Amino acid sequence: MSSDIGDVIHKTNSMEIADNYPKTCQEFLNIRDEMFELFLRKQADYGPTNVGMGSEVVDTDDKVKRSLIGLSVRMNDKVQRLLNLTLNNKVPNNESLEDTFIDIANYAVMALIVQRKQWGK
């Protein structure tokens, strides 16, 4: 099967999903936009060296490793908070569960950017 046919099949399946679940797909796009807005606000506060562990540009294997460790710790903090709140039926005192989910998603995207050595560029 050529890649052109594969692309057509993929686009057809994607369109069927979007057509069958329009509210779900629209909400996904809305959340993506919220994630990006939060990312921009936090980057304005923290700057790129926060993720780069002191380096503005993450472009070496060593910098990638250090940055991924830092991001993993931050993600784990959020996951542990989420587990504590949900397993113990607690109401959050500070940030909402929704904020926690968005933070985890943003950390995951940031980790991908770091992994691809595009952070700070």
Each language-model region and where it sits:
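Intrinsically disordered, low-complexity regulatory regions
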Residues: 1-121
